[in-house]
Design a protein with these regions (language model features):
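N-terminal targeting segments with Sec-dependent signals, encompassing both cleavable signal peptides
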Residues: 1-187, 191-217
Length: 217
């Protein structure tokens, strides 16, 4: 109830009204309302339709293009994501857009382009993680460890393993927020690096149970 009241005060329309107008009469909504409408659904197809409409009504606002890029990226369509991010950058090359273009470049193996984009992404909260991944790709493991800082992610642990900081890697893997098959796989690698055969066996078993494709590794 308080959230609804808040929306009335800030936007002037309830969530229900905004959702309805987004599909029936989007021209009644301003850019903030339209972008907000996309957050009221968890259906990527509906989000895409709303953001696409926003790009038509407000072509000079980069955010809808950027968000379409994120949706494409999450769906695994890297080329489509890149074209949306480039369109967003042509409207307004914000640090966030540069960050996203850097991630695309890194995925495509263009480390020089990734570094250039990340250089324009100062202030984004993901920069440390992204630079860490870039340094791993470049083989600069100590710099990668420094970039990740105290981040508790699989990528941070990988950097620590490659830099031979095994105690830190073990602590990182034990504190990953949402551990997955790759977390277990890295724990197995760590076990192999530290001659802990029982850790290798138990971690590999757990990893393969979550993702059978890891058995081939």
């Amino acid at each position: 109830r308080s959230r609804l009241t808040l929306n009335y005060e800030i936007i002037g329309k309830s969530d229900e009204e905004i959702t309805k107008l987004a599909s029936s009469n989007p021209s009644e909504l301003n850019v903030e309302e339209l972008l907000y409408a996309a957050t009221l659904t968890s259906d990527p197809a509906k989000q895409e339709a709303i953001y696409t409409q926003a790009t038509k009504q407000f072509p000079n606002d980069y955010r809808a293009f950027n968000n379409l890029g994120k949706l494409a990226y999450q769906a695994g369509n890297v080329d489509k994501a890149e074209s949306y991010f480039k369109k967003a950058a042509s409207v307004n090359a914000t640090p966030e857009v540069n960050m996203n273009l850097g991630l695309i470049s890194l995925m495509k193996g263009d480390k020089a382009a990734a570094e250039a984009y990340f250089g324009k992404a100062a202030g984004t909260k993901e920069l440390g993680e992204s630079m860490g991944n870039l340094y791993i790709a470049q083989g600069q493991y100590e710099r990668a460890v420094n970039s990740f800082g105290d981040s508790k992610t699989n990528s941070a642990a990988l950097a620590q393993i490659l830099a031979k900081d095994y105690n830190k890697a073990k602590n990182t893997l034990a504190n990953v927020t949402r551990p997955d098959a790759y977390t277990d796989y890295l724990m197995a690698v760590l076990g192999a690096r530290t001659n802990n055969s029982s850790m290798v066996t138990s971690s590999l078993k757990s990893a393969v149970a979550k993702d059978s494709s890891l058995a081939k590794k």
